[in-house]
Curated annotation (Swiss-Prot):
Residues 31-80 form the Myosin N-terminal SH3-like domain. It comes from the Eukaryota. CDD domains: MYSc_Myh7. ATP binds at residues 177-184. This is Myosin-7. The modification Phosphotyrosine is found at residue 1307.
């Protein structure tokens, strides 16, 4: 494009190089071999010149004068200077990183910020305003192709717009790049461009409401509103978008703006409460504080100082490039233009102000408590006022939130840190939800009621991020970019490769999009990073470190993209690394779980939902907390809101975005940030290289290098490069452009692999085009120097020639002047000079007179023509008016037709939506039915559990009552003991009285007493030991008490769970009611759909009426056109008259001798006017004809379209009715299944009850043992008290030894009673152990049953494997039979594989382009319907064929009976049968293989189809494959027919060969003909014929003996005759078809017979030889008859084998059915096993629950024991008091010396026995305790074993389930094979029918052969007679 053309763009200097620059670049010195790029540490790459090359290394001098030495492979060549600042980098000769970098750098230095790189555009941020976006530039780019204009964002936008209009396809523009690269600005420019070129014009202004702008204004003003709340200052960018957006701009059918909508992604909500130092919060906060609108500050109760609010001044508060006050007014006016009400605006401002006040809330820690308390209420009151809340409730919710524990709400205390975190989370949530609400509100405004056809989506999203500290947000952004890059790769490189295929270049398709699939799968697939993160979020005890451990366990060392990072000192710690396409990124996982869960204070959220501020309550209206029930109506796939994590939401949004993008034609824009200092014109090479790698620009170049990036049309190539070798393309003769290019390239010294020839272009590898350019430049330089030399010589010669001519002319002039000077004064010459003027004046006067006359005549004619012209003009005006009226009418009709088309389109869309809704409703109905069944089952289960828990509660209450009774008994015992102590006190008083009397005796017994005291000391030591043992026992008792306390807690927990289950049952009942209501609604909706279909039918009839009206209108228009044509004919006549008159006038003028200049000009004007009128008339007629033709065509098209739509609607109605009936049937099936399930459940419940009864019995026994243990503990306490009392009595009162002995006897009795009780308890324990063993035995029995069932299943699997092996044997058998045609089958296989591969590629293309799927969807549905019809027909045909098969079997039996004795022709049918059977088996194998391929194809299709319904896709794909298989089958049938024809030819040849045994054939044919008429008669005729033949044989044998000499000669004659007979046979076969030919053949045979007669005359002796030969033939005949008998036996054997094969086929089908039934029984058994397993699990859970209950009871008993221990301590205190009294009274014991001596022996004996008993008792108790502990440990072990066993059972069930699935697959395959066998049987039947027809044909041919043989025999007889006559004559003559 020249500079003159570029001037239209206004800013040419910023868009493209000038011509001067281009010329300078071409003349700049450049050496292709020396000018290179070398790597550099600072600048990445620098330009250099090669100095030398040595040993694989290169020494080069850089531009800076620095000499470097690098490896040769690191050196990269520079492009020629003419490629500098090239607009499309894909056209560079050398495509590599430095070339791209320097091309961008040079362009950026000249402020050319836009560059193409193949299919996408690269833009660099200029950091300054450039005049490239004004209205002049917009107008220049409008309607321009990409190649016609310089690179620009407007060019991308206009191309997208033009593609949308021409291709009728949605478009998208993907703008990506890092923060500060200019994404937002380019997005604005794209929207600005569309708003200008596609403005809806006057109509939008008419529709404009006061206070609101036009649609294009609203689209433009949506940006300021979103930027105020979504943009902020960052380190790199003052106006950085902190969210991604996808703006869809919708257009009508004519390309006018219709509406728009916006989707947003990944808002950075953490910025609301935290900013880095060099950054700041969202713009809206600072705009409000700018004090531009003071009323806002008053309304929000804030100041204009940002430092007064904690959330917003953490970084910077002002930005030099942004005026916050002006931006506030822009935001406010944008709200007005977008139609926000004042209430909505104020609500937004209030919530923003409330967030600022949130940051100022202060809390303090309460003293001595971990509880936060408010520190002032001013900010809380302000924020509560702005949010429409109660301040006290808000504070209470912050400090004391309510948490749901079980079924109850509990108030939880919060510390200061927790409260501040909750405030931040609430502020972020409010801001995020407010931003999302704003987006939906803007979308509602941009949604107009105008019809919309297509849209262009603009995606502005953050680019790839690699920071020092990368967290969860970076993972989400990088994952998004990974998906987008994969989409970009697929689109770009698939298009590139499609062009190669289109051009016919040999190219193996490379799917570059899969390069990134490993990383994408690592992030999003199940058990990968995202799913593990979501799983960890569900566990309460999970932490970031457990998340890290799971990641390492699952992926470290298993995935190449997952790596362990290298932590560097001074940098943030990294936990794992991911290898992305842009580089390896280290991620830090701290806080990921919290970020993903994003929890909120639900108490405060509840307040928000009740807020008086309408906007706030709406924002949180749909919020459901962690304790809220899951919404069942949305199906199982939806999780509850508690599990709607950030990662899940992000993936859902990303999947929606990708589906949107896949349905469009994408255009890519890559934005690049040149430097981080925001300096204009400066480019930081390493930064730009990093972005180029991240943006995929270099990736695109890498893939581009694999292909052919440079391509030129053949004509252009020939024109441009013919100069390289003109001799290759001769000048004189015509040569095609392609052939010329081929010849030219082959003549050059170039590697042929570097270029390829397409259909229209020649393709070059990267670098070759630059080489050609260099060669062309060299050639041009040589040619130009030669031309310059020649031109200089030519110019000098021309100059010399001019000098010579000038000299000659000067000589001539000189000669003439000299001559004139000689005659000048001559008198006659003077006279001549005077007379010459007078002669001309007379002639001029005559001419003037004639011209005046002519002028008068012309003037009159002119006046007449003027009047005529005026009349014609008036008529023309009237005609033009009529034409305009007609055009208006046509326009109105076109508008009506367009409206009708739009309505039809809307109807089609409604139909599609209805179908989708019906599918959704059916799916939801199925899901709800499943949920209903599950809920009913859960409800019943919970009811059973409730009843069990109630029983447990009753049992616990009984045990409590018993315990209370025991407690009362112990209290009574304590009272009795206190009374006994009082009695002892009285005894002590009496003893004090006796003390005085005994003092004297005491003095004497002191010595003896000392000895006794020593003994007592030993006793006290033994007592201490016993007490220690007692303490140990008490410790064990305390442990038992703790266990009992735990059991009590578990019991309380169970009670809470019971309440929860009851509540959940209530909820489930409510859900059930809701489901019933939804079912009713669905019925109502179905009725509504039927009504809607009827309405659509009515609408169709209305459209038909309208069509009739339009037809009538068109007929009227045609009549008007006819009238206009007649008028046009009249005008044509007038025009011809005028032209005649004009010609006459012109002739007159010519006769008059010409006219004046005025008349000539008038004539010219009139002619021009007449020509103009003529042209106008012709144009008008052409326009009328064109409009009429267009109207007719449009009418026909509209009629056809409306008819198709009506047919489609009728089909839809029928389909809906079918689906309705199918749904009803499915409902009936579901109800029957439900009844069966209910019955099975009732049986299971009965079994559960029996087991529960047994468990209750065991439980009661366990409780009895517990009670006995409690009794033992109480008795042990009593023993301890008694032991203390005994010791005290021994020490204090020796006088009361007799009483102690009595007490001892009572205690011994009590001990014996205790022993008896212990023995009873041991017995009870033994019984319990027996019961436990029996229960274990039952469990073992159940386990054995389960193992038996598994063994049975294994046996079934063995049977199935045997069946499979049999099938495999059959297959191998068939394969061995089919060896003869393996090559053909392999070819068929290859064809099939190729077709399947093509189908797979088609499926991939379909997956990649969902839009094309949408178009083909209707066609596929029609094909499916046709297939269904074909299937029904084939079923009917199959039934008919079954009937034919039975009839055919009968016919075969009859034919077999008829032709058992004589069928020599069956040999051919046997061969045919063999070949057909082999073909059948081959077809069968091929069909089985095709079925296997079909199955694999189905599975792949299921995986690939995500959004289109699986059913339609599978049917479509199977339909395609079935069509292909039918084609293959037809091909194979054609081959079979060819083989049959070949067999027929073989049969014919066999007939020729059997000419030797004509008599045997004659006999056979006679027998066969007789069987057809009457078997009996033919038998008789055969016998007579045999007798005749025997007579002839006898006569011939008699003559044989005499004629032995001439045998050799007769043999020769016989051979000759056989040849003649063969010729006759051939002629006779032709005689069947044509009678005339038959007669000719008879004549030829007669002539041949005459010849043979002459030969026989010559050789009389040959007759006898012939007779001898005939005898030999008779013998051969006999032999052949024997062979025929053998062949019949073989045929019978083959028939039997065929029947056996059929029988085996039937048996295999029966086996398949048996296997199917076994499979169903296995499935039922599996269901039973699952039910048993679930029952066992429930039982185990109940046992565990009972153990917990028992533990709780034990804990309760321990508490009671603790109380009793306290009472014991009190008693011990009293005993200590008594001991003190004893010490005081020891002095009084002297008097009791004598009694002490007596009592000494008794005391010693009794004490020892008592001690021995106590020790024995202690040992028994210890043994019992150890046994009890052992039992407890065993029970724990048993529990663990049972748990392990349960896990094993679950694993086994899972394996069984998998095996069953495999069995199901096998059964399905077998069923498919059975169907294939059925089809093959049908095909065999068809083949049998064809064989039967062939047999009849052969039979007919045999009849004809019989006739021919009869004729031949008669002729032979004649010959014999003649020969005999001749022989007789010869004998007579002799």
């Amino acid at each position: 494009m020249a500079d003159r053309e570029m001037a239209a763009f206004g800013a040419a200097a910023f868009l493209r190089k000038s011509e001067k620059e281009r010329l300078e670049a071409q003349t700049r010195p450049f050496d292709l071999k020396k000018d290179v790029f070398v790597p550099d540490d600072k600048e990445e790459f620098v330009k250099a010149k090669i100095v030398s090359r040595e040993g694989g290394k290169v020494t080069a001098e850089t531009e800076n004068g620095k000499t470097v030495t690098v490896k040769e492979d690191q050196v990269m060549q520079q492009n020629p200077p003419k490629f500098d600042k090239i607009e499309d980098m894909a056209m560079l000769t050398f495509l590599h990183e430095p070339a791209v970098l320097y091309n961008l750098k040079d362009g950026y230095a000249s402020w050319m910020i836009y560059t193409y790189s193949g299919l996408f555009c690269v833009t660099v941020n200029p950091y300054k305003w450039l005049p490239v976006y004004n209205a002049e530039v917009v107008a220049a780019y409008r309607g321009k192709k990409r190649s016609e204009a310089p690179a620009h964002i407007f060019s991308i936008s206009d191309n997208a717009y033009q593609y949308m209009l021409t291709d009728r396809e949605n478009q998208s523009i993907l703008i990506t790049g890092e923060s500060g690269a200019g994404k937002t600005v380019n997005t604005k420019r794209v929207i600005q461009y569309f708003a200008v070129i596609a403005a809806i014009g006057d109509r939008s202004k008419k529709d404009q409401t006061p206070g609101k702008g036009t649609l294009e204004d609203q689209i433009i003003q949506a940006n300021p509103a979103l930027e105020a709340f979504g943009n902020a200052k960052t380190v790199r960018n003052d106006n950085s978008s902190r969210f991604g957006k996808f703006i869809r701009i919708h257009f009508g059918a004519t390309g006018k703006l219709a509406s728009a909508d916006i989707e947003t992604y990944l808002l950075e909500k953490s910025r609301v409460i935290f900013q880095l130092k060099a950054e700041r919060d969202y713009h809206i906060f600072y705009q409000i504080l700018s004090n531009k609108k003071p009323e806002l500050l008053d309304m929000l109760l804030i100041t204009n100082n940002p430092y007064d609010y904690a959330f917003i001044p953490q970084g910077e508060t002002t930005v030099a490039s942004i005026d916050d006050s002006e931006e506030l007014m822009a935001t406010d006016s944008a709200f007005d233009v977008l139609g926000f009400t004042s209430e909505e605006k104020n609500s937004i401002y209030k919530l923003t102000g409330a967030i600022m006040h949130f940051g100022n809330m202060k809390f303090k820690q309460k003293q001595r408590e971990e509880q936060a308390d408010r520190d002032g209420t001013e900010e809380e009151d302000k924020s509560a006022y702005l949010m429409g809340l109660n301040s006290a409730d808000l504070l209470k919710g912050m400090c004391h939130p309510r948490v749901k524990v079980g079924n109850e709400y509990v108030t939880k205390g919060q510390n200061v840190q927790q409260v501040s975190y909750a405030i931040g989370a609430l502020a972020k949530s409010v801001y995020e939800k407010m931003f999302n609400w704003m987006v939906t509100r803007i979308n509602a405004t941009l949604e107009t009621k105008q019809p919309r056809q297509y849209f262009i989506g603009v995606l502005d999203i953050a680019g790839f991020e690699i920071f020092d500290f990368n967290s969860f947000e970076q993972l989400c952004i990088n994952f998004t970019n990974e998906k987008l890059q994969q989409f970009f790769n697929h689109h770009m490189f698939v298009l590139e490769q499609e062009e190669y295929k289109k051009e016919g270049i040999e190219w193996t398709f490379i799917d570059f999009g899969m390069d990134l699939q490993a990383c994408i799968d690592l992030i999003e697939k199940p058990m990968r990073i995202m799913s593990i993160l979501e799983e960890e979020c569900m566990f309460p005890k999970a932490t970031d470190m457990t998340f890290k451990a799971k990641l390492y366990d699952n992926h470290l060392g298993k995935s190449n993209n997952f790596q362990k990072p290298r932590n560097v000192k001074g940098k943030q710690e990294a936990h794992f690394s991911l290898v992305h396409y842009a580089g390896t990124v280290d991620y830090n996982i701290l806080g990921w779980l919290q970020k993903n869960k994003d929890p909120l204070n639900e108490t405060v959220v509840g307040l928000y939902q009740k807020s008086s501020l309408k906007l706030l309550s709406n924002l949180f209206a749909n919020y459901a907390g962690a304790d809220a029930p899951v919404d069942k109506g949305k199906g199982k796939a939806k999780k509850g809101s508690s599990f709607q994590t950030v990662s899940v939401l992000h993936r859902e949004n990303l999947n929606k975005l990708m589906t949107n993008l896949r349905s469009t034609h994408p255009h890519f824009v890559r934005c690049i940030i040149p430097n981080e200092t925001k300096s204009p014109g400066v480019m930081d090479n390493p930064l730009v290289m990093h972005q180029l790698r991240c943006n995929g620009v270099l990736e695109g170049i890498r893939i581009c290098r694999k292909g052919f990036p440079n391509r030129i049309l053949y004509g252009d190539f020939r024109q441009r490069y013919r100069i390289l070798n003109p001799a290759a393309i001769p000048e004189g003769q015509f040569i095609d452009s392609r052939k010329g290019a081929e010849k030219l390239l082959s003549s050059l010294d170039i590697d042929h692999n570097q270029y390829k020839f397409g259909h229209t272009k020649v393709f070059f590898k990267a670098g070759l085009l630059g080489l050609l350019e260099e060669m062309r430049d060299e050639r041009l330089s040589r040619i130009i120097t030669r031309i310059q030399a020649q031109s200089r010589g030519l110019l000098s010669r021309m100059e010399f020639k001019k000098l010579l001519e000038r000299r000659d002319s000067l000589l001539v002039i000189q000669w003439n002047i000299r001559a004139f000077m000689g005659v000048k004064n001559w008198p006659w010459m003077k006279l001549y000079f005077k007379i010459k003027p007078l002669l001309k004046s007379a002639e001029t006067e005559k001419e003037m007179a004639t011209m005046k006359e002519e002028f008068g005549r012309v003037k009159d004619a002119l006046e007449k023509s003027e009047a005529r012209r005026k009349e014609l003009e008036e008529k023309m005006v009237s005609l033009l008016q009529e034409k305009n009226d007609l055009q208006l009418q046509v326009q109105a009709e076109q508008d009506n037709l367009a409206d009708a088309e739009e309505r039809c389109d809307q109807l089609i869309k409604n139909k599609i939506q209805l179908e989708a809704k019906v599918k959704e409703m059916t799916e939801r109905l199925e899901d709800e039915e499943e949920m209903n069944a599950e809920l009913t089952a859960k409800k019943r289960k919970l009811e059973d559990e409730c009843s069990e828990l109630k029983r447990d509660i009753d049992d616990l209450e009984l045990t409590l009552a018993k315990v209370e009774k025991d407690k009362h008994a112990t209290e009574n015992k304590v009272k009795n003991l206190t009374e006994e102590m009082a009695g002892l006190d009285e005894i002590i008083a009496k003893l004090t009285k006796e003390k005085k009397a005994l003092q004297e005796a005491h003095q004497q017994a002191l010595d003896d007493l000392q000895a006794e005291e020593d003994k007592v000391n030993t006793l006290t030591k033994s007592k201490v030991k016993l007490e220690q043992q007692v303490d140990d026992l008490e410790g064990s008792l305390e442990q038992e008490k703790k266990v009992r306390m735990d059991l009590e807690r578990a019991k309380r927990k169970l009670e809470g769970d019971l309440k929860l289950t009851q509540e959940s049952i209530m909820d489930l009942e409510n859900d059930k009611q809701q489901l019933d209501e939804k079912l009713k609604k669905k019925d109502f909706e179905l009725n509504a759909l039927n009504a809607r279909i009827e309405d659509e039918q009515a609408l169709g009839s209305q459209l038909q009426k309208k069509l009739k009206e339009l037809q009538a209108r068109i007929e009227e228009l045609e009549e008007e056109l006819e009238a206009e044509r007649t008028a046009r004919a009249k005008v044509e006549k007038l025009r011809s008259d005028l032209s005649r008159e004009l010609e006459e006038i012109s002739e007159r003028l010519e006769e008059a001798g010409g006219a004046t200049s005025v008349q000539i000009e008038m004539n010219k004007k009139r002619e021009a006017e007449f020509q103009k009128m003529r042209r106008d008339l012709e144009e008008a007629t052409l326009q009328h004809e064109a409009t009429a033709a267009a109207l007719r065509k449009k009418h026909a098209d509209s009629v056809a379209e409306l008819g198709e739509q009506i047919d489609n609607l009728q089909r839809v109605k029928q389909k809906l009715e079918k689906e309705k009936s199918e749904f009803k049937l499915e409902l009936d099936d579901v109800t029957s299944n439900m009844e069966q399930i209910i019955k099975a459940k009732a049986n299971l419940e009965k079994m559960c009850r029996t087991l529960e009864d047994q468990m209750n019995e065991h439980r009661s026994k366990a409780e009895e043992t517990q009670r006995s243990v409690n009794d033992l503990t109480s008795q042990r306490a009593k023993l301890q008290t008694e032991n203390g009392e005994l010791s005290r009595q021994l020490d204090e009162k020796e006088a009361l030894i007799s009483q102690l002995t009595r007490g001892k006897l009572t205690y011994t009795q009590q001990l014996e009673d205790l022993k008896r009780q212990l023995e009873e308890e041991v017995k009870a324990k033994n019984t319990l152990a027996h019961a436990l063993q029996s229960a274990r035995h039952d469990c073992d029995l159940l386990r054995e049953q389960y193992e038996e069932e598994t063994e049975a299943k294994a046996e079934l699997q063995c049977v199935l494997s045997k069946a499979n092996s049999e099938v495999a044997q059959w297959r191998t058998k068939y394969e061995t039979d089919a060896i003869q045609r393996t090559e053909e089958l392999e070819e068929a296989k290859k064809k099939l594989a190729q077709r399947l591969q093509d189908a797979e590629e088609a499926v991939e293309a379909v997956n990649a382009k969902c839009s094309s799927l949408e178009k083909t969807k209707h066609r596929l549905q029609n094909e499916i319907e046709d297939l269904m019809v074909d299937v029904e027909r084939s079923n009917a045909a199959a039934a008919a064929l079954d009937k034919k098969q039975r009839n055919f079997d009968k016919i075969l039996a009859e034919w077999k009976q008829k032709y058992e004795e004589s069928q020599s022709e069956l040999e051919s049918s046997q061969k045919e049968a063999r070949s057909l059977s082999t073909e059948l088996f081959k077809l069968k194998n091929a069909y089985e293989e095709s079925l296997e391929h079909l199955e694999t194809f189905k599975r792949e299709n299921k995986n690939l189809q995500e959004e289109i319904s699986d059913l339609t896709e599978q049917l479509g794909s199977t339909g395609k494959s079935i069509h292909e298989l039918e084609k293959i089958r037809k091909q194979l049938e054609a081959e079979k027919m060819e083989l049959q024809s070949a067999l027929e030819e073989a049969e014919a040849s066999l007939e020729h060969e059997e000419g030797n045994i004509l008599r045997a054939q004659l006999e056979f044919n006679q027998i066969k003909a007789e069987i057809e008429r009457k078997l009996a008669e033919k038998d008789e005729e055969m016998e007579q014929a045999k007798r005749n033949h025997l007579r002839v044989v006898d006569s011939l044998q008699t003559s044989l003996d005499a004629e032995t000499r001439s045998r050799n000669e007769a043999l020769r004659v016989k051979k000759k005759m056989e040849g003649d007979l063969n010729e006759m046979e051939i002629q006779l076969s032709h005689a069947n078809r044509m009678a005339a030919e038959a007669q000719k053949q008879v004549k030829s045979l007669q002539s041949l017979l005459k010849d043979t007669q002459i030969q026989l005359d010559d050789a009389v002796r040959a007759n006898d030889d012939l007779k001898e030969n005939i005898a030999i033939v008779e013998r051969r005949n006999n032999l052949l008859q024997a062979e025929l008998e053998e062949l019949r036996a073989v045929v019978e054997q083959t028939e039997r084998s065929r029947k056996l094969a059929e029988q085996e086929l039937i048996e295999t089908s029966e086996r398949v059915q048996l296997l199917h039934s076994q499979n169903t029984s296995l499935i039922n058994q599996k269901k039973k096993m699952d039910a048993d397993l679930s029952q066992l699990q429930t039982e185990v859970e109940e046992a565990v629950q009972e153990c917990r209950n028992a533990e709780e009871k034990a804990k309760k008993a321990i508490t009671d024991a603790a109380m009793m221990a306290e009472e014991l301590k009190k008693e011990q205190d009293t005993s200590a008091h008594l001991e003190r009294m004893k010490k005081n009274m020891e002095q009084t014991i002297k008097d009791l010396q004598h009694r002490l001596d007596e009592a000494e022996q008794i005391a010693l004996k009794g004490g020892k026995k008592q001690l021995q008993k106590l020790e024995a008792r202690v040992r028994e108790l210890e043994n019992e305790l150890e046994a009890e502990q052992k039992r407890n440990a065993e029970s724990v072990k048993g529990m663990r074993k049972s748990e392990r066993r349960i896990k094993e059972l679950t694993y086994q069930t899972e394996e069984d389930r998998k095996n069953l699935l495999r069995l199901q697959d096998l059964v399905d395959k077998l069923q498919l094979k059975v169907k294939a066998y059925k089809r093959q049987a049908e095909e065999a039947e068809e083949q049998a029918n064809t064989n039967l027809s062939k047999f009849r044909k052969v039979q007919h041919e045999l009849d004809e052969a019989e006739e021919r043989a009869d004729i031949a025999e008669s002729q032979v007889n004649k010959l014999r007679a003649k020969s005999r006559d001749i022989g007789a004559k010869g004998l007579n003559e002799e």
